[in-house]
Amino acid sequence: MTAVGAREVYQLFRDVALQQKTLRPDVGPHWRDVDTGSVWVRIDQHRIALFKDAGRLHHCLRCELDDGRVAEQQAWDSPGTDPLELLSVWERTQLLRALAG
C-alpha cells in the first residue's frame, strides 16, 4: 500500500475550500469548543485529525483515507511538508470557515 502524501491530503482541504467536498465534525469535540488540542473531522469518508493551538489551526496530526491508508504527523515532519502549509491564504481562510461552520 502506498503512503499518504501531503499533496493528497492538501487536495482534500483544497476541495473543501472550493466547495467540491464537504467537511463535517467527526467523533470528539467540535472545532469551536477546543482552544488547544486535537479535533477530528471528516471529508467524505476520510478522517483527519487537526491540531489547534491557542485557538489557531496549527498542523495536521493524522489522516485516515477511505482506502485504508494512514499517515501520522511524522510523515510531514520536514519544514513545509504539512498539508496545511500547502494551502494558499484564500484556501486556508475557506477551510477555517468550514471548520467554524
Task: List each language-model region with its residue ranges.
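Intrinsically disordered, low-complexity regulatory segments enriched in Ser/Thr/Pro
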Residues: I48-D82
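Helix-rich interaction surfaces within compact, conserved domain-sized segments
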Residues: E85-A100
